[in-house]
Structure formats: structure tokens, C-alpha cells
Amino acid sequence: MKQGKKFNYKVEKAAEEALQYLMNKQFDNASEIATKNLKKKHKHPVFLFAKSVDALLQGDETLFRSEFDKLFKLSSVRYTDYHNFGVFFQQHKLDVLAVECFSACVKLKQDFFEGHEQLGNSIFNLGEYESALGAYATALILKPKSKELVISAGKCCTKLGHYSDGLEYYQSLLPDYPFDSNVRTGVASCLISLNRESEAVAFLGKDIDKSYEPEKDYYLLSLVSYNNFKLDSALKFAAKGHELNPDYLPVLKMYGTCLGRLNIHSLAIDILKKAIEKDPNDPEVFYNCGNSFQGIGEIDQAREYYFECLRLNSEYYLAFNNLGFGYSFQGDVGKAKECYGIAIELTPSREDFHSNLLFTILHEEKSSPEDHFREARVWQDKHAIPIDQRVKEYKFNPDEVKKLRIGYISGDFGDHVAVYYWLPVAQQHDRDKYEIFLYSQKPREDDFSKSINVEIDKVCDQRRDVSGLSDEELCEQIVDDQIHILVDLSGHTAGNRLRALSYKPAPIQTSYIGYPATTGLDSMDYYITQPFSVPLEHEDLFSEKLAHIAGCTSYRVRPGAEKIESKELPYKENGFITFANFNRAGKVTSECMRAWGQILQQVPNSKLMLKVNRLDEDDFTNDFYECLDDLGVERGRLILRTRSDFLLYLEEINEFDLGLDPFPYNGASTSLDLFYMGRSFVSLTKGRAFHENIGASLLKFFGQEEMIVSSVEKYIERAVWAANNMEVLEEDRLKLRSFFLTEVAGGGAKVCASLERAMDVMWKRYCDGDKVDHITLDGIER
């Protein structure tokens, strides 16, 4: 309204209605009012603004700009109009336009506090924190006691990395607002950023029961614990915050995330679904929910959440990595490699993604051990530390060492199958001669892990959680611990720290148990194995030198298994033969499926029992059904069982007569579990790779050489032969368990003694300055 012009109540009322419609996103109503009044030549700024918004909604930026610029030429525009226009743009996340409006607002009225405040807010939203701080500073001159402004200024300082200034802003509010959660968490956040974390935690803990919104305080405490890998504490704080306010979104997300990380997946899914209802646009929540579905074996359901995560953020590389895991687990190696490839392309520095790709190659039907070796060397070229950056001096004098320090590093200390191979050996170490250090990369805090960790703690002199250490910090820790021989138990499996080991933090470094192939690293000196698993003539498949030790392997079943009896083969009672494979689907290739289908063809009325992720059909089951259809085998001859706890799984082994080993990646612990339950299996040895010969190695050790074959045709023939000679398998049933208990579960002392002799050879060679070379067994150890 021009200065001096008579106030027109009807026009102002119409303008007020149009503005209200705009704010409520009722754009058609606003446009109708604006058009009607503009025809009457009522050039009120609000009507012109409404027409410019019309152009914006139609995507005509040129027309919008033309109409919008007319506003700034009107002398009748009031500072409140500019403020209202700015608020509209702010609500629609058009902060660039909001800044134009708020700037015009404070130019017309320099002492308009709200204009400076909102100008600062929009500039903040644009990420221009220095300019935002300037706007807030101007507003604070006008209203120095404004709590909201001081908090906003503090946020700007933290965004700029000026944590001391931010702390000063927040602390200035404490005398008047000692229990305001926004003030308290602001103070604590700045303290944390200033490396005064203990002060922050103590500050938040004090008077938390008096805090106005304690869920915010608990959320920050949970976040601190989470970032320090203290997952139990993180869960405790998040749970308390959730109890106090189940609708507070940050704590809801944190609670679900902590539950998932601690393998409490069912509750995690429930909580994260609630978070998604409140915020359907956060890719991280979809990702974490997918992780929990994957954690309970619901791979297809997990995939849906990963896809939704990627819809929201097409470069969310973690989702691609986990999609790769899911496809690999279900046996779709092609899609797994594709997903890992995308993840690696998005983040070339993530060596763990590259390790996942390497592990997947082992499952590939057409790949060779040479393919894996070449890719492992590529991993070294891309991720390992250059030779000139390796540790050059160690903090000990070899001549003064009286007791060897052995370091074991793994991502699997806890309830993981690798531990059940390692623990029977580790329990036999001569503690007078060897000092044992453990480096745990992936804390496992579930109930089963807590139980087994009690045993693990007894076999070591020092155990360190290194999951929060960088590669450089981990290297420094190992050097400071003066480790003489470092034994990696992970290889390229999850949780490995091979990049840290490429620094060569110990003078002797070896790979053992966890990975059935080479690491590909020159910094790893030895690969510890048995001669019939990896003979010397396969040395070209390893960058490491081979260190042969005695026995077959050491492995024990989980507690409670001693109560599970081996029952007679069920073929007599059933009236038909039951074959089985309890390995994960990722090991079952299409060639494998077809061979099993042909066995069913040739053994009338026989059935095949499989472990699957879900009883309703998934991709793996559908592929198997299609294979059976193609062979003319009834689908009903497939018996599906879901994954179960270990003791039930052992009971289920009693329900079949003969195992069928997958190929080319053979079973390992599953095959040993079969022996424990008195079941044998047919195994195909196809090539030179370790993982292609695991089944043959175990069968030889158990005196079951007749079950080893060298072609798919012979694999089928041997299974058919076994079906016709069940009495032979029944005769061996109890012998297999007895041999397992004495030579495998009870073989830890023999294996450990041989391992220690090999370590002594390694140490002597190092002290004498001899080159690293193969270590072979003498006649006695064989």
C-alpha cells in the first residue's frame, strides 16, 4: 500500500486470506483470490507474490523471476510482507529465495529482530555458517537474552569448528537455564569436540533427572558410547531415552541401531519400523533395518530395505556392499560381484569391500585359484601400505627375548565358528614359553559370546578391543606390545585388519584358520596349514610361504552337544534314503543342484533335506525347484528346514542318512558336525584350491577315502552306491564320532605342539637373519 493511500480493508483482508492459503499449501485458492484482485488493479504485494508462486509451481523459472522481481520495485511492500514471503520460502526449503526476502526485510527495518533471526536460519540451512553467525550476532544486539538465538549462534560455531566459542555461547545460558536439554547437550557436544569427553559425560550425568527433556541427554550419552564402540552402554542409554519419550526420533533411531548391532534383531526391526513411519526419508534407517532383517536370515526382506535406502540415496555404498553379501549368501555370485563392484567404485578406499569381493570369488563356479590369487595381489596394490612406510624397528632385542609373545588378531572372538577351531589349540599353549595377546576387532556381546569369552579370556595374558583403532593406531599398539609373531585369524573375511598388518607391526606375520586362501600380502610371511590340505606343490597359489603343522584340524562342537546322541541311520524306519546338505546356499552352484537332482532321479523315493533361510520360497529355493522340474523330479522330494540353533541343528542331522558336500566350495565345520553325529558324505575334489579340497582332506583323515570322487559323474555314482550300501555307513557311524572326539576335538594338544614347533622355527630364522621359507613336517609329526 503506497504511503498516504487510503487503507482498503477488503483488499487487506483478501491479501491476508491469500497469504494464509499459501502457507497452508492451498495454492489454487490463493491464486484465485490473487487473480480476482489483480483484475481490479489491486496491486497488493501479496497478490503479485501469489502469481509468482503460480509460475514457480508450473516450473516456469523465467516467468517466476520476472513476477518476483516486480515485488522489489513496489514502494508499497512492507518489511512484514518480505518477512512473510521469506517464511513461505523457508517452509518449502527454498532458502536462497528466503534469504532474498529476509535481506530486503531487515534493509527496510534494521531493528526488526525476527527478520535478522530468520535470515540467519535460512543462511544456516544453506550451509553458510560464517554469514549465518553474522546475522545471529546482529539479532543478539537487538535481543541479547534470547535463548534460541544464543543456541543458534552456538550451533554455527560448532559447524565452523570453533568449539571453544560455541562452548562459551552455551555456557552463558547455564545460569538461567541449567536444566534445559538443548543447552546441556550443546555444552556437552562442544566438550566432546574439544576432546573433553569425560567432562561431557559427567556433565550430562549430573542432574539428568532434572533435565526438562532428558531423552535428549540420554541420546547424546548413547551416541558417545556408540562412537566409542561401547555398545552395551549405548543401548542402555538409548533404551532409557526411549522409555522416557518413545516419540523422540533421534533416540528412536539410535535405540534401533544399537539393538541391531548387538544382534537383538527382532526388536530392532520393530523399533526401526516406527522410526521409518516418523521419518520415511532417512536412508540410514532403511539401511539399519535391512541389516537386522539380514541378521535373522530374511535376505529377501533385507533387500527391499536396501533398495529403498538406495532410492533415497543412490550412492549409499554400504547398502550396495550388504546387497552383495545377501546375493552371495543365496548363491547368486554374479549379482554379488556386481554389487561389490559398485560399492568399490563409489568408495575405492574401502578395502573391506574389496575383501568381500575376494571371498565371493572363492564361491564362483567358473573361477580358478589363480583368479583369486591375482585379485588378492590387486588388493595389495590398491590398499596395502608401501614398503617404505612399514615398521623399520621393533622395540625389543631378539637376543634378550626369553618368552615369545604371540599375538592373535581376529574379528571373530566370541560365538563364531572360527573360535571353535582356534580355542582347542590356544588352550594348549605352553604359557611358560609363550605369552599370548589377543586383538579383537569386532566385539561380540550376545549371551552366547559372553559365555565363550570367559574361556577365551583364560587362554591369553592380554586382550585388547581394537575395533575403534585406526590402522596406524593398531600398528602402533602391536609394536608397543612387542609382539614377536602375529597370527591373523581372519584373512579376507569380515572384520579383518589386513591393511594394518601391511605396516608389518610384528617381525613375523602369519595367516591361520580363518580363510582358505592366500591374503596376497607380501607383509604376511607364512600360511599355516596341513600338508594334505595345501601340499607344497600348490605353493604358487600363495604369496605366503607354507608352514605345515600336524593333524587335520582342531574343532570342537558347542556346549550342550555332548547331550545329543548319534542315532541310527533312519533309512530303515523311513523306508527311503534321505540325503542332505546343511551348508549355506552361497556354496551351492547350479552344477551342484543338478547333480543332486540327478541323484534323486537314480535313487527311487529318496529325498533331499536342505537348510534354507525361509520356508516360503526365496530365489535359492525357486532355482532348486526349477532344476528339479527340468529333471522331472517331484518337488515334494525336497525337505526344507530353516536355520536353527546349534543343538537343534545337530538333532536334525540324525534325520538323514548321507551328506552331499557342495562344490567347488566344500563344507568345513558342517562336515565336521556330520562326523560328530556319525554321518559321512560324498565330496568332489575338483582342483588345486584349498576350499575345493576341504571335503577330501577331512574324509582322508577320517578314513573315508571311498567317499572322495574326482568328477560330477563319479559324485552321482558314489551317492547312488552309498544309497545301496547303507549298512556300511551304519557300521561306521559310532566310529566317526569316536574318532572326532579323540583326534579333532581332542587333538588340540597335538596341533598346538606342532604349531609351537613351527613358530620356534620362524623365530629362529628371524633371529639368524635367514630368509622366510616353507616349513615342513618331519616323519614323527606326520
Feature roles, as predicted:
Residues I409, F582-R584, K611:
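Short hydrophobic "strand-cap" motifs at the C-terminus of beta-strands
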Residues T493, D661-T670, L684-N693:
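Nucleotide-sugar-dependent
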Residues F656, D673-T685, F702:
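Conserved donor-binding/catalytic loop of nucleotide-activated donor transferases
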Residues S440-E445, L608-N622:
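Glycosyltransferase donor-sugar binding loop
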Residues E435, N605-K607:
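Residues at the starts of beta-strands that form the adenosine-phosphate
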